[in-house]
A protein has these predicted regions:
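Bacterial Sec-dependent N-terminal signal peptides
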Residues: 1-23
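Active-site His/acidic residue clusters
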Residues: 151-157, 231-236, 240, 248-251, ...
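N-terminal catalytic scaffold of extracellular/periplasmic and nuclease hydrolases
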Residues: 22-185, 189-191, 198-216, 316-381
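Short amphipathic alpha-helices and their capping/turn segments at secondary-structure boundaries
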Residues: 130-134, 215-218, 248-258
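Gly-rich Lys/Arg/Thr-decorated short loops/hinges at beta-loop-alpha junctions or inter-strand turns
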Residues: 109-114, 226-236, 272-277, 349-351
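Functional beta-strand-loop-alpha-helix junction segments that form "active/interaction loops"
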Residues: 120, 210-248
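Metal-dependent active-site segment of extracytoplasmic phospho-/sulfohydrolases and closely related
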Residues: 62, 288-329
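Acidic-aromatic/histidine active-site loop/patch
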Residues: 185-189, 193-196, 200, 221, ...
């Protein structure tokens, strides 16, 4: 009897130590010292969609959003969304997805395998929202803060079974038909192993290739533009300022000249990086930079009246948990449960005509399907 009691005591002690080790994860604290004002944006009354702007926070979950809300003293531009939903992100061969598979589902409406970009599980190229827009006579563009050979921008313009085949992916851009591109990663466009000079190929296709910010922001003609001012990623948020917002608005300005409309994908790319690094301060700065870009885009969409804005994520990164904080001080205390992606559902927010079609719980492929219907018909019947 005493042996059984001793065994029970030891077992309970082991369980207690295990539980403590499991839940006593190290926390990080961040206080946002540059809080910004947020305005209430009145949603347009129109019902017909002419343009769609899809904004992807790479690795962004509900916890990222609420932590950023707390850091900015209890307000975000994102709160102007008039509809919210939840998206399931699984890949065909793996529950926890990546930006290749998750982004491809958003871009093409097809579930695919882990690491695949713009192709189905058998490697067959898929039709993306860029292709849909072009077939409708609309313009199409992308603006990102990552390298243009990263998965998310490639999901919309390129095709490969393996996202790590970066030079092959970049080689697909000249044939993509995309009208406006802004991002980093110039080093994969020239000096390549295959001898191709992708910048020259783009010029032959009629693109203006911009290698500096001054040239990019001064550009004011109707021909296509491919802007790659950085060899790798764009700079950190403290260094680049509101570059994502400015680049996005430049794309909107240029593509809005097409009377038939446009589709644009904008990505807050580096949220994912700092989720992987478990670096709370930089993660929050990236999330808040993305939110300020959302604000600029939503304000423009409200004035335009025919533009739907959809904000979502391809997956969650870092297993972020907000464990404490103070929204009056802008202080957040968080922990991370992984340095990789998690399998959490991700939020979907919508603003503008057609927003009501993005409520509920659904597959990430449904985001594509609903956007395609709205781009094609202006409404969902």
């Amino acid at each position: 009897m005493k042996i059984n009691r001793l065994f029970a005591i030891v077992a309970l002690a082991v369980c207690a130590v295990t539980a403590s080790a499991q839940y006593n994860m190290p926390t990080q604290t961040f206080t946002y010292d540059k809080p910004y004002a947020v305005e209430k944006i009145k949603a347009p009354k129109g019902k017909k969609v002419k343009n769609v702007i899809l904004m992807i926070g790479d690795g962004m979950s509900l916890m990222h959003v609420y932590t950023a809300w707390t850091a900015n003293r209890g307000k975000l531009w994102l709160e102007n969304a008039t509809a919210t939903g939840l998206s399931k992100t699984w890949a065909t061969n793996k529950l926890v997805t990546d930006s290749g598979s998750g982004g491809t589902s958003l871009a093409t409406g097809v579930k695919t395998c882990y690491h695949a970009v713009g192709v189905d599980p058998e490697g067959k190229p898929l039709t993306s929202l860029v292709d849909v827009a072009k077939e409708l006579g609309k313009d199409a563009g992308i603006a990102v803060t990552c390298r243009l050979w990263d998965a998310t921008p490639c999901d919309f313009c390129c095709h490969n079974i393996d996202r790590d085949k970066e030079e092959e992916l970049v080689g697909d851009y000249p044939a993509s038909g995309v009208n406006f591109v802004f991002g980093g990663g110039a080093e994969k466009f020239f000096g390549r192993k295959d001898g191709r000079d992708i910048f020259n190929e783009l010029r032959v296709k009629g693109y203006h290739v911009s290698r500096s910010l001054d040239d990019f922001f001064a550009y004011d003609t109707n021909s296509n533009i491919f802007a790659v001012p950085y060899d790798k990623d764009t700079p950190l948020p403290d260094e680049r300022g509101d570059l994502l917002a400015r680049a996005s608005m430049k794309g909107i300005e240029l593509m809005n000249r097409n009377k038939k409309g446009f589709f644009m994908m904008i990505e807050g790319s580096q949220l994912d990086d700092y989720g992987h690094f478990n670096q709370l301060d930089m993660l929050m700065k990236e999330t808040l930079d993305f939110d300020q870009t959302i604000g600029k885009v939503m304000k423009w969409a409200a004035e335009d009246g025919e533009t739907l804005v959809v904000v979502t994520a391809d997956h969650e990164t870092g297993g972020l948990t907000l464990v404490n904080g103070d929204k009056n001080e802008g202080r957040v205390e968080c922990c991370f449960s992984t340095r990789d992606h998690s399998g959490a559902m991700v939020p979907v927010y919508a603003f503008g005509p057609g927003a009501e079609h993005f409520t509920g719980i659904y597959e990430n492929t449904d985001v594509f399907k609903r956007i395609k219907q709205l781009l094609t018909n202006g409404v969902i019947k």
